[in-house]
UniProtKB/Swiss-Prot annotation:
Protein name: Putative GTP-binding protein 6
Binding residues for Mg(2+): T298, T319
Gene it is expressed from: Gtpbp6
Superkingdom of origin: Eukaryota
Transmembrane intervals: none
Gene3D superfamilies with a match to the protein in the record: GTPase HflX, N-terminal domain, P-loop containing nucleotide triphosphate hydrolases
InterPro entries: G_HFLX_dom, GTP-bd, GTP-bd_M, GTPase_HflX, GTPase_HflX_N, GTPase_HflX_N_sf, P-loop_NTPase
Domain Hflx-type G: residue ranges: 285-449
Species name: Mus musculus (Mouse)
UniProt GO MF annotations: GTP binding; metal ion binding
Cofactor(s) listed: Mg(2+)
Classification lineage: Eukaryota, Metazoa, Chordata, Craniata, Vertebrata
Positions of the UniProt region annotated as Disordered: 48-71
Biased segments, Acidic residues type: 59-71
Keywords, in A-Z order: GTP-binding, Magnesium, Metal-binding, Nucleotide-binding
Family: Belongs to the TRAFAC class OBG-HflX-like GTPase superfamily. HflX GTPase family.
């Protein structure tokens, strides 16, 4: 069995075989010590005694089995070293056809690449190289002369411990060639972003989604390495009479892992749907805040909600786990802000797809807020990247069209005025534009959810006022001179207003103009 595991993938586990649950007779005395995890709930025996949890009556707890399966799926070696790294950022500067404007300058592409490296604890940029490349998809990425120059520079810098090739994906043969030529680990943008995600992910769901996103990377590694291992023999081409070569065995293990991850994520998706249903039942409007990574989404939500527990960080992908935060609009209507994962240019589609369960919350929002960091030189490219990604998520057209555009960090751009009508200039640090944003949010939320602001005349001695406090948002109660009635201003849904008129037909006149 140990040989079997070694044949699959270093650091990669074969699918577990579900353990048989043994029910021990009370008369049997175990000769080995046992450890009680929770009194009266689970006892773990020795390995020779059958292992695994022993439950009273032989009944399995499905939740424990689910957790065990999830824990197993989350066990995987890191994609990149966890220790200190001094990285050479190598950027292929692709020449554009004459007359075609580049999407971004090499300078800012390198700056973003360096920021990704520095987002990891203990990692630093030892050097940066911008090298012309006519065909970055070729085997060696660069032409013969440029490749020779790059090799000399990398080998001449003793401080470098690894090389970040700033391309979306590197073909396995290219990775092998470059690592052989330079004697260092070489990784691409996809691998680095996945590693950053791994380091920042906190919830089981985010970690599961990352494990699924890693499958193509592991599969390409299997396809590259296993052929060599087959040719080198491994003692025998076939393992334990299974009729499968190491390549086939490892590929099958990956297929099984992918299926199990998708099953677990679907289970987690179902739980998320239940949470959404509860929010709908309680009629909390939901506002999703989206934008490029490190554009200031979390800081903005903190300014809107006053939630001290939020801890914004000035680094890419500081937010990976979708979080929900309650806030009040000027009308005193309570809404929920959803802080989402930031987007990035040249982010592989399957990585976004892996986070579809998390980003599904965006599709069910009432209002979308698109935040753009206008202090960044590539603000327009970042904005286009976010819009392109949102369109790829197949969001409802009405939600996309009604999105509020927020230009953030305007305190870093003196005298800034939005170039397009409808955009809101906001600084979460100085407070500029926050009141205008709250007013715009309120108008959008009321419109999207069918709520309205009404002033109703109700009797103070009856149950009407108490009902309104429970079913609507009471903004103001103005007692009338007669003393037994009041004008009550409320934010109320059309459905709730219909129920109010049905319950109190005599005392519910038409709403007064507001």
């Amino acid at each position: 069995m140990l040989f079997l595991r070694a044949a699959v993938l270093p650091g990669f586990w074969l699918p577990r075989v579900r353990r048989v649950q043994l029910v021990r007779s009370p008369a049997v005395t175990l000769p080995s010590p046992v450890r009680t995890v929770h009194a009266g709930s689970r006892v773990w025996g020795s390995a020779w005694a059958g292992g695994g949890p022993v439950r009273g009556g032989g009944e399995e707890d499905p939740r424990e089995d689910e957790e065990e399966e999830e824990d197993e799926l989350l066990r995987a070696p890191p994609l990149l070293p966890l220790d200190t790294q001094r990285v050479c950022v190598l950027h292929p500067d692709v020449k554009r056809p004459a007359g075609k404007k580049p999407r971004s300058t090499a300078e800012w592409q390198v700056a973003e690449a360096a920021a990704l490296v520095r987002a990891l604890p203990g990692w630093s940029v030892a050097s940066t190289l911008v090298v012309p490349s006519a065909a970055p998809g070729s085997r060696l990425v660069f032409g013969k002369g440029n490749f020779q120059d790059v090799t000399e520079k990398i080998k001449g810098c003793q401080d470098i411990t690894s090389v970040f090739l700033n391309v979306e994906r590197m073909a396995p043969p290219t990775k092998k060639e470059l690592e052989s030529a330079w004697g260092l680990r070489v990784f691409d943008r996809f691998t680095l972003v996945l590693h950053i995600f791994r380091c920042n992910a906190r919830t089981r769901e985010a970690r599961m989604q990352l494990a699924l996103a890693e499958i193509p990377l592991l599969r390409s590694s299997v396809n590259t390495d296993s052929g060599q291992q087959d040719q080198q023999g491994w003692g025998s081409r076939y393992i334990m009479g299974s009729g499968e070569s190491p390549t086939e065995l490892r590929a099958r293990a990956l297929r099984d892992r992918e299926l199990r991850l998708r099953r677990v994520l679907e289970r987690l998706r179902d739980k998320r749907r239940l949470m959404r249903k509860e929010r709908v039942r309680r009629e909390f409007p939901v506002v999703s805040v989206v934008g490029y990574t490190n554009c200031g989404k979390t800081t903005l939500i903190q300014a809107l909600t006053g939630e001290a527990a939020l801890q914004p960080r000035d680094q890419p992908f500081a937010t990976l786990d979708v979080t929900v935060h309650a806030g009040l609009l000027p009308s005193r209507l309570r809404i929920l802000y959803v802080d989402t994962i930031g987007f990035l240019s040249q982010l592989p589609h399957n990585l976004i797809h892996a986070f579809s369960a998390t980003l599904e919350d965006v599709a069910y929002s009432d209002v979308l807020v698109h935040v753009t960091d206008v202090s960044h030189p590539d603000a327009e490219l970042q904005k286009a990247t976010v819009l392109s990604t949102l369109r790829g998520l197949h969001l409802p057209p009405a939600l996309l069209e009604s999105a509020l555009e927020v230009h953030s960090k305007v305190d870093l751009v003196p005298g800034y005025t939005p170039p397009c009508s409808g955009a809101l200039a906001v600084s979460a640090i100085s407070g500029r534009g926050l009141d205008e944003l709250k007013a715009a949010l309120e108008a959008s939320v009321l419109r999207a959810t069918g709520r309205q602001v009404l002033t109703l005349c109700v009797r103070l001695g009856g149950p009407q006022l108490g009902w309104l406090y429970k079913e609507a948002v009471v903004q103001q109660v103005q007692e009338l001179p007669e003393g037994d009635a009041a004008h009550v201003t409320v934010v109320i849904t059309q459905a709730a207003y219909g129920r109010f008129r049905k319950l109190f037909p005599i005392d519910a006149p038409s709403a007064l103009p507001h």
